[in-house]
């Protein structure tokens, strides 16, 4: 997987996480949109991902985050961003917690590390 393909998978994972509790808030949509710009993804590449990902629930789960060519520090930073997005509104729903745990495990982050991130970001 190339780094550009990986960036699109990361955006898809954020969209899946946003939909975990059945709806995407404006704050989550803004968070993901800002992230796409920050990641320096070409507009023509990420716009279709965002339009599809934010307009309806994903058809398939993101299962290949481990294949993205990023180092350990970047993996931790990515999961911290997942957690930060989940905490934008009322808190972490059970559905979001399940998706978050699955995505974090793909990136080599265990439950203890994930809980430490959540506490640090609260």
Q: Where are the model-predicted features located?
A:
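Small-residue-enriched hydrophobic alpha-helices in membranes
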Residues: 1-122
